[in-house]
Structures are given as structure tokens and as C-alpha cells.
Amino acid sequence: MRADWIAKRRGQANVSQMHYARDGVVTEEMAFVAARERLEPELVRAEVARGRMVIPANVRHPELEPLAIGIEACCKINANIGNSAVTSNIDEELAKLRVCLKYGADTVMDLSTGGDIPQIREAILRASPIPVGTVPIYECLAHVKDVADLTPELMLEIIEAQAAQGVDYMTIHAGVLRDFIPLAAHRITGIVSRGGALMAQWMLANKAENPFFTHFEQICEIFKRYDVTFSLGDGLRPGCLADASDAAQFAELKALGDLTRKAWEHGVQVMVEGPGHVPLDQIPMNMEKERELCSEAPFYVLGPLVTDIAPGYDHITSAIGAAVAAQHGAAMLCYVTPAEHLGLPDIDDVREGIVAYKIAAHAADVARHRPGARDRDDALSRARYAFDWNKQFELSLDPDTARAKHDETLPHEAFKSAEFCSMCGPKFCSMKIHGHLAEAAAAQDEAANGAAAKPAGGLQVLP
């Protein structure tokens, strides 16, 4: 779809959406997302120029159907896929991608850490019509025996290679600085971000500052050539409730705000990653803090989990926090699966995580009165009241599961037009009872109106 759009920009030094927006240009991508979001194209352009909206759309990813992430857009969700050093393969990752697309993930991140990482990423990119993100530090580690052996040159080389391949956004842990490491020393769970821990290890081993920070402007130069969006990593995010909203987290967040504005000077798009594990009552404050420190750049949050006691159910503990975060301004939610803290997610875990987060994002869109956000809810409610079971399944976030649940007790097709379910049966269905009451009331009203319009029997009206 984007091949012709991209061809017109070939040879330009900066092809980022922010660059064009600041020049007053409404790109084809901006017009496309405006239609998707029911927004005016000029509003999209202004939001991208301001930095409050991003359109991750690498010019080397022509398969992409552009989308917007920002406070004026519907809340988006990301699903993580990718192998580990001990399990998974290309076919399995592509199967996960198909599940992501089926159930409505807005973006995917390839977090592969083993095998032929570029080959896996290439397969995902060519099959993905949604933005693809990565964490470059993972591939960097595949080229060295020890994290201490990483060089800035290698890191920039890997970033350039991923950009040239078509990656739309990258998590860059540039805000984990040497001075911040001691701030996390007394945490219960320490540094829980893989990228954050790796950069801390590198800095301690090399007695030097974070190379993502010292070489940030070189990364900006790469990103603007391909239109890669920064996803500034929260390497010091809290990994448990006790560590939430501490000095380490907010020191890094302030640094990410400075880096956001630095990237904007280069015309590069930015979103900022956020926690993590946060008590429910602290979530609004965390959202406000990001807006304040990061000049309203889109906030991309992992959950947050609102309790630490439910391994196996962290798609639920985090979706609760995600809904609150989105209601208070988070622009994109990174899903959490039932396998979180326990192992590598399988396809079923991916599906459950996506559905949980689609619910959270949708609930926030309804609460924020997004244009058309409640249309599907109202349509399903009407189908429910009309006992149109097939329409209810069709409108569900997960039609297969909705139908399967109905089939468990009423499997025959005849029951798909029945005016009851197995919970209440035909005698106790409140909607059926109300339907009869409504019909009776309507009949009474009609009779009353007819009687009022008709002269009383036996009386003659004299001229």
C-alpha cells in the first residue's frame, strides 16, 4: 500500500513523519490514520509536529498499514513475540504473529534472543501489516561473548541494520545512567528490565557512561533516514509494588524527557516507556509525571501490574492497571500474558494477553469518550436483548471463545435463536420477561391513545 508514498521520498535526508509535519505537510500516512481515527488530517499533522502523536512507519516496511499512537488517538496495544535462547522457531513466531493479527494487536515487538535473529525478524516484518518494534541490545549480545565486550560501534551497526530491514520502532535504553545505578541498590527486585540490567552491567564493567546515551545523536541520525520511532526504554522501571515511584524510576524518567526533546531537535518521533508494577492509587500520578517531564510524548506502559500475588494471572492484574493508565492518558499498552514471570508465552498465552488488553484499551476509550468508541458495545447490547446469539458472537472481542462457552451447555444450532441461555432458562430470563412487559405496555398505550381519539359510545355530537 505504501510503496508509491515511500518512492516519492527516496533520497531525502530526513523522511520522518515529524519532519514532514513540521514542514506543514499532511503525508499519506497522516491522512490514512486520520480516517481510521475519525480525526481531521490537520489535527493529526499538528499532533505529530508537536510530538504528542507518533506514526511508526519505517520507509523499508511497505507492507505496513499506518496507525497513530497518541493522546488524541484510540488507545493501542502491543503484543510481544519472539523466541528465547532455549525455545521457539520461525514457524512458531509467525503463528504467534497470526494470532496477534486475528485478535487485534496494534503493534508487535520481536524480542528474539536466540537463533538467527535477523532471519526471524525478516520473516515477521514481511508478514506484518502492523508496526514492528525491537530491542536492539538483544541482537548485539549475540555478537559478543560477554556484555562487557560490547562496543558503541557494534551497537550502532546493529541499530542501522535493523532500521534498514524495516523495523518501525526500537526500544533504546538511553536513560539508564551511571549515577542512577546506586538508586536501585536497595530495591526488593533491583533492576528488572533486561535492557536496563545489561546496560548497568556494561557501565560497571567498563567504568563508562551508557553508550546509548553518549551516542544518542548518532542514533537520531540513523532513525531520521528511515523514519524509525524511538521507544525510550524504562530500564529502571519498578519490578514490584514496593519499588514503585522511587528515586531511580523518576531519575530515569527525567533523563528520558531530556532525550525526548533532543530527538525532537532532529525531527525524530518518540514515545516513552513506563512501568511496570504500580499500586492502583499511584497510577494517575505516574501518568501526570510523564506528561510533565517528557513534554507530553506518548506514554507506552507495561501494565502496570497492581498486585504481585497472582503468577499465572498477571494478564488480569496488569490489565486492571492498564485500563486506569489508559484512562489517565497512556497512549499504548504493552500486553502481559498469563506466562509473565513464569516462562516464554505460547500461542494460547498470546491470545489471552491480547484479549485482556483489548478489553483494557477499549474500556479506557469508552471512558475518554473517543468518537465511536461505544458503538460496538451498543450494537452487542441490542443483539443481546434481541437474543441474536450469532450477532453477539460476531461482535465479541473473541468470537471463538464466546461461541464455545455457549456451546458448552446449548450446543445445537436451534439454541442460537432461543430466547434464553442455560443460566436462567426460558422461565427466569429477565430480558425475555421485560420484553413481554414492554409489549404489554405498548399495547396498553396504543389502546389508551385509540380510546382518547374516539368519541364515547351512545353520545351524539349535535351540529
From Swiss-Prot:
It catalyses: 5-amino-1-(5-phospho-beta-D-ribosyl)imidazole + S-adenosyl-L-methionine = 4-amino-2-methyl-5-(phosphooxymethyl)pyrimidine + CO + 5'-deoxyadenosine + formate + L-methionine + 3 H(+). The keyword Metal-binding applies. One of its GO terms (molecular function) is 4 iron, 4 sulfur cluster binding. Binds 1 [4Fe-4S] cluster per subunit. The cluster is coordinated with 3 cysteines and an exchangeable S-adenosyl-L-methionine. Zn(2+) binds at H277, H341. Pathway: Cofactor biosynthesis; thiamine diphosphate biosynthesis. It holds the Pfam family ThiC_Rad_SAM. Its EC number is 4.1.99.17. Substrate binds at N80, M109, Y138, H173, S193, R194, G195, D234, G235, L236, R237, E273, Y300. Keywords: 4Fe-4S, Iron, Iron-sulfur, Lyase, Metal-binding, S-adenosyl-L-methionine, Thiamine biosynthesis, Zinc. [4Fe-4S] cluster binds at C421, C424, C429. One of its GO terms (cellular component) is cytosol. It comes from the Bacteria. Its cofactor is [4Fe-4S] cluster. One of its GO terms (biological process) is thiamine biosynthetic process. Belongs to the ThiC family. Homodimer. Catalyzes the synthesis of the hydroxymethylpyrimidine phosphate (HMP-P) moiety of thiamine from aminoimidazole ribotide (AIR) in a radical S-adenosyl-L-methionine (SAM)-dependent reaction. This is Phosphomethylpyrimidine synthase. It comes from Anaeromyxobacter dehalogenans (strain 2CP-C).
